[in-house]
Amino acid sequence: MKVSDKDKKGLYSYDRYIAAHTIMFSFEGVPGIYFNSLFGKSNDEAKYIITGNNRDVNRYRWNELNILKRMKNKNTKEHYIFETFKHLLNIRKKQKAFHPNALRTNINLGNNFFCIKRISLDKKQTILCLTNLTSKLQNTKINKKFSKFKNLIDPHTKFQNLKSINMKPFETIWLSNT
């Protein structure tokens, strides 16, 4: 988790990492997550250099005591990433629109956003999954019908009767009608 063309100084490395996974969590099917990804572990490039085996890049071996210690410390990357993923996956598993076979529709909002709409099999729940793909505050207009939806990720956020949404760098919102 270093820098990218969208985050040249690496100021939002955790946010970018979580945004990438949140996008994956919004797709159909069951998300596959590498064990190391649960803790935000970077690729093990040193291991790859030693072995030359491409697969070794994501096969970091944890010391059980070390990871447990880092998980207990609320100030570590490992704790933050794991708790955030746990929060997102707990939300996801409760939503009918995130059923593996629920409908997905892509919505083009330009290069600064990733957006899809998920509709439950019974057509009763719609979730708009929206991610800011940049390191800047972005504003996007939203369809009037979505302005009364609630944000599943942060229920304290109110979007009542909005015509547009301001989104922080690499922020994701899941707007649901139920």
List each model region and its residues.
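Short aromatic-acidic-glycine turn motif
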Residues: 147-156
